Amino acid sequence: MGGGLLAATLPAQAHRAKAALTLVRWNAAAKLLEVEHKLHAHDAEVALSQQAGIATPDLSRLEDQAKLALYVEARFSLTPPGGKPLALKLLGAELEGDHIFVYQELALQAPPQALAVEDGILRDVFRTQLNQVNFDMAGGDPAHIRTLTFNGQDKAESVTFDR
């Protein structure tokens, strides 16, 4: 017989990491600080079940999307040095495939120079949750992108922006 390829099939052991991504972006044209949170829909539904008391959450329902948006709003903050947390306006949420997006924004005259960030999203539900916050304050210039990560018992982290 000729040389063949033997392929063994093993049960899939892949496990999706518990992670969320937030993008904080300065929109210079609109003078807006825009915040976009991206969560895995299943993880968000578990959070709604455990933290909001919804027996069977369904993120295709607008009511459950609104409750998730309020959950996210309560667990994420941006605070300028020596100031109070920014009053981010909650815009809403939308489901796209396996992910749910929550949107916030705030009108400002100029982008902040520095921020203290707290990100407890899903960290009260999953012990191994890892949250990444990316900051784009310079129109997408990769040299000016800043990143913070939150896991375990992390509290506020600080970030500064150079232009």
Language model feature labels by segment:
Residues 7, 12-14:
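Boundary at the C-terminal end of the N-terminal hydrophobic targeting segment
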Residues 14-163:
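N-terminal soluble domains immediately following signal/targeting peptides that reside
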Residues 1-2:
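N-terminal export leaders
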